[in-house]
Amino acid sequence: MSQILTKALLELADDHLILGHRLSEWCGHAPLLEEDLALPNMGLDLIGTARSLYTYACQVENKNKSEDDFAFLRNEREYVNCLLVERPNFNFAHTILKQLYFSVFMELYWSAALNSDDEMLVGIAGKAKKEMAYHLSLIHI
């Protein structure tokens, strides 16, 4: 059971980490000042969620690893993120559409996770759901 949970946590964490870094690429390059500030902040939210998920995965796996081991000490083939989040930022519209897809899906996911029996996951989900709702409001949904 712990291997399945660890794998699921890593999938979620990798999605959030990679997309967080992709969004931060817009710092100083977005078409308007509002977006120039909002996109990197959304990226920071995602990276914060990734940190929580990596930390929880370390606790579940119980092999004396740190969140940094999962986030930075793996080769590129060991990441288990979905392909959507790693796609390059071709242009601003593409980035916003990618963020829309991810945020809608994750808001639904985190809403469902709030009903979990896993208290740690519920805690992460509570914060992440609020952030996803905020991200959706920033992209005017």
Predicted regions and their residues:
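Acidic/His metal-coordination segments adjacent to aromatic residues that form catalytic metal sites
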Residues: 1-10, 73-98, 116
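Short, Lys/Arg-rich amphipathic segments at extreme N-termini
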Residues: 3-26
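Alpha-helical scaffold segments that form or flank carboxylate-/histidine-based iron centers
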Residues: 4-11, 30-49, 95, 120-134
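Amphipathic, well-ordered alpha-helical segments in soluble domains
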Residues: 15-23, 49, 53, 102-109, ...
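Helix-loop segments that flank and shape redox-cofactor active sites
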Residues: 19-41, 105-122
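Carboxylate/His-rich catalytic cores and anion/metal-binding grooves
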Residues: 41, 47-65
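Internal, conserved structured core segments that host functional sites
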Residues: 84-137
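Conserved small/polar residues in nucleotide/adenosyl-binding loops
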Residues: 140-141
